[in-house]
Amino acid sequence: MKTTIQKTLMTARLFSGFWDRWSVHGVEDHVVSEIRPQLGNLEVWTDHFNKSGQLNENLAHSFYEKHLVNEAEYYYRLSALYYNLNQWIYPKQNDDKTYWFQKCLISIRKADAISSIDTRYVSIEISNHTCFGRVRLPANPVGCIIIVNPIDSSKEELFKYEMDFIRQNFITISFDGPGQGETYTFQGLKATQKRWMDFTDTVIEYAWSFFPDIPLYLFGTSSGASWAIYGSCNPKVTKAVAVSPAIRSEGIDLPAYFIERMNSVIEDKETILPNLHQLNIHKPIFMFHGALDVMTSSKTIYNLYDRLPSDKKFLEYEGEGHCCNYKLEKIRKLSMMWYLE
């Protein structure tokens, strides 16, 4: 019987779509093409991405010595993404996952240390456990965006989101919630629907307590999009963007490796998603959908959109699947324009 890691490696070797998420978040094409044919065991994976991480870390150091700080910052973040791939491959909390996540955090903090944007490492308490977050503070903020990450992603993976939002002078707040990233790896806190409700509410209250005079926006993808819609019901939130929201009770066939990964981080096997049909949604929502999405059907998305208040927007991409991966950069630009309308 194949383990979850073996199933993940097989999927990565056989299906190019596996890599879409990682490619749009920064993983280089040549790094993927070099490893795919060789993906027979875990050691090949960790060795390859460790070398890629070290290579980019060295490149970042070289740029920094030449006073090319922006380039150095980017390549430190890219090196962290490769180390993040190594922690991600382990579905369950263990020493190896912890080791690679620590390497990821070291690279991220090297990037933060040389960045012109102030970064603060923060935390909140959920179910007597610490949830770890980061806040980035441009000098003259026009708004504050809470990035709600998909359950299978860490905040470090989505560094391009931060970069795009910060360039346009938005404060960014990004936490790893129950079952996610740094919080799961170091605290062992698993996801339940109730914990995610508490987490979303607490992050919004946290943002409001520090930035009460700045418009508060939400940006979420996949399960994070569903929780962004939930969060939009909070009166402190101004607007929310939902990219490919995951809908509960959807009769879909998810890949075996993904189901097993989720079972490792979810305590309540029923669902960790909010029941969107029970929410009193009244704030503006901009929803994005990929027509080729096999995780959430177009019919389900259309039905949800019809229930939203009149001040809403919808954009569907014919050639995109779940999370609209290859349109994410454009989606972030459109979202920032819409936030400020």
Predicted feature descriptions by range:
Residues 142-150:
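Short beta-strand element of the alpha/beta-hydrolase
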Residues 225-272:
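Hydrolase active-site cap/lid region
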Residues 190-211:
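Alpha/beta-hydrolase active-site loop
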Residues 161, 283, 297-306:
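Short alpha-helix in the alpha/beta-hydrolase fold that links the catalytic acid
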Residues 320-329:
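Catalytic histidine-centered segment of alpha/beta-hydrolase-like enzymes
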Residues 165-183:
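Conserved alpha/beta-hydrolase
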Residues 49, 53-56, 92-138:
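N-terminal cap/lid segment of alpha/beta-hydrolase-fold proteins
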Residues 280-282, 287-289, 293:
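Short beta-strand/loop motif that positions the catalytic acidic residue
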